[in-house]
From Swiss-Prot:
Entries under InterPro entries matching the protein: PsdUridine_synth_cat_dom_sf (IPR020103), PsdUridine_synth_TruA (IPR001406), PsdUridine_synth_TruA_a/b_dom (IPR020097), PsdUridine_synth_TruA_C (IPR020095), TruA/RsuA/RluB/E/F_N (IPR020094)
Keyword line: Isomerase, tRNA processing
Catalytic activity: uridine(38/39/40) in tRNA = pseudouridine(38/39/40) in tRNA
GO BP: tRNA pseudouridine synthesis
SUBUNIT field: Homodimer.
Top-level EC class: isomerase
NCBIfam families: hisT_truA
Binding locations of substrate: 125
UniProt name for this protein: tRNA pseudouridine synthase A
Record-linked SUPFAM superfamilies: Pseudouridine synthase (SSF55120)
Primary role: Formation of pseudouridine at positions 38, 39 and 40 in the anticodon stem and loop of transfer RNAs.
Keyword Amino-acid biosynthesis among UniProt keywords: no
Keyword match tRNA processing: yes
Lineage: Bacteria, Bacillati, Cyanobacteriota, Cyanophyceae, Synechococcales
Length: 295
């Protein structure tokens, strides 16, 4: 039987909803969503589910549609099945059929009313910047290497805090979005430096198409003093999308988790499971940036 082929089911066959906590290394995927003539996380996961439950067409629904090259530490997915596999056995069963770049950390039974995307009350992303002098091969797949100057994370934090609340973020939305509007609520922001690594976390009710990477490009320009706060604020408040040109590369971005009104997974299987990096001894710090450009 071919994956996702549809057969007539007995009327008594119960349909169950399964929730998954999923990790993936996004470098070789076109993103979460199925695309013609490209390999997506959704396609690979659905094909694996169909091998275990071939009785019905499978649709895997995710909390966030990550772009090509973006990673996930705690993506949340649901699908409906009618086979006999207990909920808690789906994780090991799927991991035996998935490539090593996709791992299911936990599987739980959910009511039919629960939806991985629509029931989520927030999504949280982390962007990692490697701000050291020398390239590091083992950080390349997971971070953006900025080595020209030492980033001013204080300036970046000030800019981030100004974004909190319900705002129109048209300036940070790529063309091609199907959303009717560009308003969303940023609930929490955080920036942390650990030696040569800067980790920026942003949590919101939802994100626009390409929003985080466009925002990170602007923050790095701020941190390098190629952009000042006044110009940054004017760009997004006045919706000057044409002036927001540089998007941060995909490999530094990771979907940490999606949150719900109730805890769906155990904390160990879901919460902040992207590793923190330790580089050992750091090189001498980079020179600070020059004064910000005037507007």
């Amino acid at each position: 039987m071919f994956p996702n082929s549809k057969v007539e089911l007995p009327k008594s066959t119960p349909v169950r909803r399964i929730g998954l906590s999923v990790q993936y290394e996004g470098s070789n995927f076109c993103g979460w969503q199925r695309q013609p003539q490209a390999v997506s996380v959704q396609q690979v996961l659905e094909d694996a589910i169909s091998q275990l439950d071939p009785q019905r067409p499978i649709q895997a629904v995710a909390a966030g549609r990550t772009d090509a090259g973006v990673h996930a530490a705690g993506q949340v997915v649901h699908f409906d099945c009618c086979g006999p596999i207990p909920a808690e056995r789906w994780a090991p069963a799927l991991n035996g059929r998935l490539p090593s770049t996709i791992r299911v950390r936990e599987a739980v039974a959910r009511p039919a009313s629960w939806h991985a995307c629509h029931s989520a009350i927030y999504r949280r992303y982390r962007y990692t910047i490697y701000n050291g002098r020398r390239p590091n091969l083992f950080l390349t797949p997971w971070s953006w290497h900025r080595y020209q100057v030492r980033l001013d994370e204080t300036m970046m934090q000030i800019a981030l805090e100004g974004l909190l609340g319900l705002q129109d973020f048209s300036a940070f939305q790529r063309t091609g979005s199907r959303r009717a509007h560009a308003r969303t609520t940023i609930q929490e922001v955080k920036i942390e430096r650990q030696g040569d690594l800067i980790m920026i976390e942003i949590q919101a009710s939802g994100f626009l198409y390409g929003m985080v990477r466009l925002l990170m490009g602007q923050l790095v320009a701020l941190g390098e003093h190629r952009l000042n706060l006044e110009t940054f604020e004017r760009r997004w408040k006045e919706k000057r999308r044409q002036e927001v040109k540089e998007a941060a590369p995909a490999q530094g971005l990771c979907l940490l988790r999606a949150g719900y009104e109730e805890d769906i997974f155990s904390k160990g299987g879901w919460y902040d499971c992207q590793p923190r990096y330790s580089l050992g001894a750091n090189d001498p710090p980079l020179d600070p940036p020059s004064a910000p450009e005037s507007s």
